[in-house]
Amino acid sequence: MVEARGISRRFGPRVALDDVSLVVDEGEIVALLGPNGAGKTTLVRVLTGLVRPDAGEARVLGVETWDCPRDLRARMGLVPSGDRSLYLRISGLENLVFFGRLHGLSRREATARAWELLELVDLVDAGRLRSGFYSHGMQKRLSIARALLTDPSVLMIDEATHDLDPEAAASMRGLVRGLADRGAAVVWATQRIEEIRGFADRVTLLRTGEVAFEGTVSQLVAVAVPRRYVLRLRNGRAAGRELEPAIQDAVRGRATIAAAADGDPEDFLLHLAEDAVLGEVLASLTAADVDVVACREERSEIENAYLNLAGSTG
């Protein structure tokens, strides 16, 4: 339903997208993942026909999206990041009726459709309330309702859970999952790695405008190369928070080690060099008479995979 092939786009000297391809099938959620500036929003705008690519082609339902016909545009729903298209001085109901009228519905049709969508996004009780009084989560749900006015086959959502609390974010994902289960093809752009597990069917990870990874969440986890660990050392401190010199000598050239900033006083943060092997470093510590009580990854598997592929060491 959604297909992008070899998309490239520059803004002056800056390369926003470089030979990016993406496919989203009916009933599928594809997470477009990456840090700020990776090119996610630009790709979403290319897919919806708002930005023309310098090279490559984007198609939705078999039709090229740039300068696409009005009837195709009506079959695509967009929830942009920081949506400013809502009118905050009128009610949620009035917002939906207004946009429904812009799409060619009669007032009666637009009103009936608005109430249907308010029920779908759980805003019926707030339908007549001025949308400026809505919480961030409620405004996001109203934005999704607006995107669904024409019953689109394809839904593009950019940073839907930004600034939402965990409960509101989970509600948003549940709503979108339900739409996909009813056949919608969904592109979900996000920089929040934790929200895609158990939600997205596939992942495309962008890094500085290029595709760094494409596959399932399980495949993403499989390529994780953890470099940072928390060690619990029973005899790790010489005095106060100072490290035993033997510890630094044991890991020198293969890792750095420092007292953890918080947590248990026996915890230390170990950061492996790129070519270092954890088992060998731990063996060196043991040989130096350092008692390694426990070792765990500083981050989860999926966080390690994301940060490794996105090129971050933070």
Give the role of each language-model region.
Residues 97, 101, 108-126:
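Conserved ABC ATPase "signature" region
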Residues 155-159:
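Catalytic Walker B motif of ABC-type/P-loop ATPase nucleotide-binding domains
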Residues 48:
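Helix-to-loop junction immediately C-terminal to a conserved catalytic motif
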Residues 173-269:
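ABC transporter nucleotide-binding domain
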Residues 151:
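Conserved catalytic motifs of ABC-family nucleotide-binding domains
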